[in-house]
Amino acid sequence: MQDSPIVLTTLAGLSTGLGGLLAALCPPSERLLAASAGFAGGVMLTASLADLMPEALAFYGGYLPPLACGGAVVSLLTLGMLTAGLLGRLLPEEAALAARFGKSGDPARAAAMRTALVTGLALLLHNFPEGVLTFFAGTADPSLGLRTAAAIALHNIPEGLAVAVPFAYATRCRTAGVLAALVSGLAEPLGAVLAWLFLRRLFTPGFLNGTVVLAAGVMVWVALAQLLPGALHPAHRTAGILGAAVGCLLMLLGIAALP
């Protein structure tokens, strides 16, 4: 196994920890929770719809008629969203989580914990194919692998933030938030290692692009169903909206800078 692609994939995955460290700089608060949820939601939506979707349409457009290409990509995106929604329903509800924070419960902390769990699980699913993609890109062309790792690291940072802030708020422990962010990124090097050991023949370009679209569906669902609603907290609506706007704009700049 070549060392360089694994190193690139590991660094890209661990960049979620940088998002966790950024979250640890400020004490957890409802305002920070709203702003970070909006920021991460903006990044995830923009990365999915302005970066991953056009790439998938361009790839499958080389093999399928336009209508069939669009139908295939939309179907995969929808399947990813449905998968994320189903997994979200399997997690504990806020009432069950609130009971763990004392006899009286704490709805705000319970909601934050559920957001952290849903987002973290979705990112594990999303990061696995990203790790495979980075690994194979680095194996085929080190320069392409470096650009791919840089692009993935760029949106992994706010993803780590999206996990760390609610986790730190729920647990009242910033270190726990950083660790949660790091764990969510470990799926990338894990995906690379498993791909190399067991799945090399399975990961054709068509299959890999399909898994990326599925992962994009997961991100879209998390952004629309979990992060952006959390950003629109009645008391901190402005912070959430500004966070979402900044996330969208920064991700667009990143896409332009790292094609």
Question: Where in the sequence are the language-model features?
Answer:
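Intrinsically disordered, metal-sensing/regulatory segments
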Residues: 1-259
